Amino acid sequence: MTVSESSVLDTEVLVGGSAMPNERPGPMEPQSLSQMPEGFPRRSTVANGVRSRASRRFFVVGGALLLSSFAIYEMGAVFSIGGITPLEYLMLALFAINFCWIALAFCSGIAGFLLLLKKPKPNELAQTELHTRTAILMPTYNESPDRVFSAVSVMAEALSQTGHGHAFDWFILSDTTDPEIALLEEQAFLVLRQETHKHSRVYYRRRRKNVARKAGNVADFCRRWGSRYDHLLVLDADSLMESSTITGLAQRMQADPDAGLIQTIPSLINGTTLMARLQQFAARIYGPVIGTGLGWWVQKEGNFWGHNAIIRTEAFMGAAGLPNLKGKPPFGGHILSHDFVEAALIRRAGWSVVIAYDLPGSYEECPPSIVDLAVRDRRWCQGNLQHSRILPTKGLHWVSRLHLMTGIMAYLSSPFWLLLILTGLMLALQAHFIRPEYFTDQFSLFPTWPIMDSDRALRLFYITMVVLFGPKIFGVLLLLKDGKFARSVGGRIKAMFSVLFEVILSALIAPIMMFIHCGAVMSILMGRDSGWSPQRRDDGSMPWLTLIYRHRWHMLAGVMLGYAAILDSLTLLAWMSPALIGLWLAVPISAWTGSIKIGEFFKRIGILATPEERNPAPICIRAQEARAAYQSHIEQPWTLAQLLKDPALMELHLAMVDKQPLRAAGTPIEPVEAIVHVKVHEAQCQQSALALFNRQEMALVLANPLMLRSLQKLPEQFVPEDLVSFC
């Protein structure tokens, strides 16, 4: 049977029809970064459809510039009494960079705080009939299939009950490379089809080669099936979204013909470890202040965070095709942090990009430990630093460039912070060990005293702390003001204990993350690529020896900084102790925060509680129940040997294999594919062939109907008289 013949079996073998709908190819060309494409920006459909208010930018960005200018002036005045030395100039420059970074967040937080004080109601549209079609995409890469497929199951069922289910199709787009997980995905898809085929259209496709990672996965869908749909609603493997949020996004997109992308602000859920619950609590208490403020002032020049957002297909395919950057990774090659770039390109083309800060019901999960956070941040750091190549792109809106710059600073701020600490330490040691030069070469009746304005320095320190902790303060004030919100996290007293605990623990973790980010930046500057590792999402625990190895340099750095401080004075050591204690205790902090047991203990006593944890949404409860059911459904995974032995099982598998041609005629064959061809051709039986395949080769075979048919023709085991002798 040929590949084309096997596809005919789809509708006969699979419940609910073929694994994927018929293709409707459409162009999605890589965009030029060096020149503005012809016809861009498009003319808005509605008058002022993509215009933003300058007054909001003046309030936030202008306020941040004014605040930064004042702080930089004050810092200069601290040093200027006795003349500014080169080391003090360096410290002033580093202070300016760091302060500008936190001032923007502070002013954005003020806007969010003032807006949330009014308790704004969601911008609800009339429940109009949806006449557009939306593809809901769930990309997955070596994730637990029970998590992914159960989430789609409950969301599809809930959406079908709204009366709008006909307007949506669901797609699980797999880039999985692990053959065992790939077969589990197929089993889970069969269960999903059984559950949903009467009320929803759910599809599954696994790519043979995961070119360009998640961005390439979504782009492959767009080029082959995107033209069938008006919108794409992109989720992540750990995403959940309430049906009202899904329909609300589609209705907003339908109502605004100039909208290119609408991004929700997801709430963090399902954290079991202390680290995950810490992130959940911080995001829930302080996150809305920043998110609301950001959405308010960026207006039509918002951003994309890669998931839990709806995108107009025309805008995405016509304007957001990503080019390959010249050179090799980490700065060249495929664009890793694709989301910021796609949002910038969509806005460049004349579509609006909006952050729907008023739309609830969007959820995601977070890394369970410091180590898992470091693994994720290493990849994000490389992608964000890669944006330095995107900043000069022709035609980008200045706010889009600011988003890119903010992403870069999210990781460069750590080296700048470390340099600021080291410079301050050197100034202290210089004052302690190096004798001042009281009389310079120029004639003077009075000596030059090495002095600073200590009162002004202390005042500036207090101002800096207020700016740094401002968003947290605003979040706490909103919590204390809103009795219902306070009760949802256990009451005001327990909430304040949680806030205090979060501040202390975050202060201990911050220097560890600073050195992790510094290490990531250094490795990228040294030319090391991050790779693409699957994420752990539940248990964050690791053996102590592994943690000692991972944090060895952090502990050593803490000891060296402490030694340098004590050379000056115990007072300096005391001032630096908030940062040093976290480094000294990096291993136990990493172990304890990654522990489910410790996370459950704090959950029992109500510390770091969130409304979503104490009173979870129905969709979250159903997802947990469905996941347990899926785990039981796929507890006996298929194997390639079983597929070869059972023709009916093989037909089921082939019905789910991607129907894209294996290889165009005349194109070079991949080395791994050539190796597999040789192994299959020379194998005496199925048993010997399976013993020769590694995991990569096994995954390739599973995606290749021709190789599977060749293996089927082989006998199951060796027959001694058929052995070939070589002499």
Swiss-Prot record:
The gene is opgH. The chain crosses the membrane at residues 58-80, 95-117, 407-429, 457-479, 499-521, 572-594. GO terms for cellular component: plasma membrane. One of its GO terms (molecular function) is hexosyltransferase activity. It is a multi-pass membrane protein. Pfam families: Glyco_trans_2_3 (PF13632). Keywords: Cell inner membrane, Cell membrane, Glycosyltransferase, Membrane, Transferase, Transmembrane, Transmembrane helix. Residues 17-41 are annotated as: Disordered. One of its GO terms (biological process) is glucan biosynthetic process. Pathway: Glycan metabolism; osmoregulated periplasmic glucan (OPG) biosynthesis. The keyword Transmembrane applies. PANTHER family: CELLULOSE SYNTHASE CATALYTIC SUBUNIT A [UDP-FORMING], GLUCANS BIOSYNTHESIS GLUCOSYLTRANSFERASE H. This is Glucans biosynthesis glucosyltransferase H. Involved in the biosynthesis of osmoregulated periplasmic glucans (OPGs). InterPro entries: Glucans_biosynth_gluTrFase_H, Glyco_trans_2-like, Glycosyltr_2/OpgH_subfam, Nucleotide-diphossugar_trans. Belongs to the glycosyltransferase 2 family. OpgH subfamily. SUPFAM superfamilies: Nucleotide-diphospho-sugar transferases. The keyword Cell inner membrane applies. Its main location: membrane. NCBIfam families: PRK05454.1-3, PRK05454.2-1, PRK05454.2-5. It is an enzyme of class 2 (transferase). It comes from the Bacteria. Its EC number is 2.4.1.-.
